[in-house]
Amino acid sequence: MIRSVETYALRKKVGDERALELVAGAGFEGIDYSFYWLPAEHPMQGADYLSYARDLRTKMDRLGLVCRQAHAPFDMKFGDAFDESDEHFRGIVRAMEAASVLGARCIVVHAVKIPEEHGAINLLSYNVEFYRALSPYCRRFGIKIAVENLFTTDRRCNCYRGVVGTPEEQCELIRRIGSPDFVACVDIGHAALTGIEPSIFLRRMDASLLACLHIQDLDYAKDRHFLPFGGTLNWDGILSALRDAHYDGDVSFEIYGFLDPVPAELLPAALSYAASVGAYLKERL
């Protein structure tokens, strides 16, 4: 078990290479590479994306960092083709390949959300087809896909609704895909946001499918992505549930809500504190 942190918030401020230096300097052992929200001019978007990934891997090796999990872009829309003729599908495949170069064991790929006007279409059946289309790439690149619990925002009532939002739906989807290349990622905050206390969500999850986490804190009102203890979640309960599940994945933070407001000059201090929080959680697992 190691401590890792997503790279999105850091990349925006200082770029990938400096982000790696800051993460290593703060004491983290790993990164969760963020392939989402990449600007068009980013090297991962270009023709030489694999060369860029190899360069990052070399720098990570030199710094003593690893990448065990990554996050694919989530641009797929209902109706997009489930093959490389579609640019969004192709972006996921590219991310899978680059993540494998970085050393990732798994990459989070969001399920495709179904618009309300197409609500007669079964969400799980639609996404079984989507994920099965990605399965050959898992084998080609030697990487697993992690299915995450998600939400959609209902602005009419200013509330959130789960998308693959219960542990039962999440596990059923993975089982229906029918491949060992698919596992579960639980976003701690998403569980709370969609009405299930995270500790209860984890206890209802099939522990054999739980491979990774997005650890964040929030206030039950919005998807804040704060550092643990910066919101109102019950971390004693969450840690207890993870211990009882014999969770052996990483302490992986998705905390751009914590890092976004921090000036670049204060990132070393902020990351050092985050690494200390990670050590605190790890010791209790």
Predicted regions and their residues:
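Active-site beta-loop-alpha junctions enriched in small/polar residues
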Residues: 6-10, 34-36, 72-75, 112-114, ...
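Aromatic/hydrophobic pocket-lining residues that form π-stacking "cages" and hydrophobic walls in ligand
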Residues: 19, 56, 95, 134, ...
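Short, well-structured secondary-structure segments
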Residues: 29-35, 66-70, 107-108
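Glycine-rich, proline-tolerant flexible connector loops at the mouths of alpha/beta enzymes
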Residues: 34-57
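Generic structural signal for helix capping and beta-alpha/helix-loop junctions
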Residues: 40-41, 77, 116, 154-155, ...
